[in-house]
């Protein structure tokens, strides 16, 4: 399913400031749903879950491609409109509604700005043993991850390097999804009671909930591509180059800095076709 909420006074992500926000998101929803139906889920139902009456031409496009539309109020996980990523929390609200109102064996939700290009059958098989979530693979030298962990510490009162799960992907069999949702609701209740505010949206809640379950990284099936004009790559601590000698000649040059650190430069001189 693709969850999407629209409320004029509510903040969305920092990535979109367009005045025609509704139109942009509905186009994204159509692409996400249609790609899932055509490429991945021919034997499964694809659903747009939303709190609005979908206008034409988008409603006609979705229904014309056998995509279901479920209307569900934004009546849970709602922190109010003046909250960073306020609308992102609707994903959890939508999941709660479909778990109550439908009876499928497996459930998955994805962000609206995705393109699905392969079958989900192997994902469903994985869900027999695990909840599948996306580890965004931030290390401690990434400022965003350090800030995320600082919020976790402030909320829990202890240091813990939990996995930062991305909000763009979740998949589980129904019984696991129901238990996961219950844990998410407990985190939400604790946040509300303590008037605790996070700047990391739904990812804060799902990452805390994931600690309690047998979660497997879905990184083999999904990858987050940052396509903005500015991107800060992570520093790689270890590079592994299997079978490198079969593909290219490698010259290794070493130099010792004044600090005594050894730096190894791999210069790829010649590529050999195999």
Positions of predicted regions on the chain:
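N-terminal anchoring/stem segment of glycosyltransferases
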Residues: 1-79, 100-103, 264-273
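A conserved donor-nucleotide-binding helix/loop in the catalytic core
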Residues: 23-26, 30-33, 77-108, 122, ...
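A short acidic, often aromatic-flanked loop/helix-cap motif at beta-alpha or helix-coil junctions
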Residues: 75-80, 139-141, 223-228
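Short, surface-exposed amphipathic charged segments that create phosphate/polyanion-binding patches used
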Residues: 82-91, 146-150, 234-237
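GT-A fold catalytic core of metal-dependent nucleotide-sugar glycosyltransferases
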Residues: 91-142
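Conserved catalytic core of nucleotide-sugar-dependent glycosyltransferases
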Residues: 120-187
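Catalytic core and acceptor-binding pocket of nucleotide-sugar-dependent glycosyltransferases
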Residues: 160-248
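Long, low-complexity C-terminal extensions of enzymes
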Residues: 235-274
């Amino acid at each position: 399913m693709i969850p999407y909420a629209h409320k004029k006074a509510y903040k969305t992500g920092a990535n979109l400031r367009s005045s025609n926000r509704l139109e942009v998101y509905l186009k994204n929803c159509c692409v996400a749903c249609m790609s899932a139906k055509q490429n991945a889920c021919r034997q499964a139902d694809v659903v747009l879950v939303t709190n609005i009456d979908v206008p034409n031409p988008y409603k006609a496009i979705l229904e014309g491609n056998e995509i279901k539309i479920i209307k569900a109020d934004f009546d849970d996980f709602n922190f109010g409109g003046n909250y960073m990523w306020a609308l992102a929390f609707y994903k959890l609200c939508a999941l709660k509604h479909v778990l109550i109102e439908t009876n499928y064996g497996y459930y998955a939700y994805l962000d609206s700005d995705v393109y699905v290009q392969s079958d989900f059958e192997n994902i469903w098989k994985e869900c027999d043993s695990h909840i599948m979530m996306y580890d965004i693979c931030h290390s401690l030298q990434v400022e965003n991850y350090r800030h995320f962990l600082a919020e976790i510490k402030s909320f829990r009162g202890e240091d813990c390097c939990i996995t930062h799960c991305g909000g763009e992907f979740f998949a589980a069999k129904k019984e696991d999804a129901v238990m996961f949702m219950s844990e998410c609701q407990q985190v939400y209740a604790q946040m509300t009671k303590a008037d605790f505010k996070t700047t990391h949206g739904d990812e804060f809640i799902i990452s805390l909930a994931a600690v309690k379950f047998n979660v497997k990284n879905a990184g083999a099936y999904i990858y987050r591509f940052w396509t903005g004009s500015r991107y800060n790559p992570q520093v790689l601590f270890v590079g592994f180059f299997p079978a490198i000698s079969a593909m290219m000649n490698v010259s290794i040059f070493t130099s010792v800095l004044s600090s005594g650190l050894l730096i190894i430069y791999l210069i790829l001189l010649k590529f050999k076709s195999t």
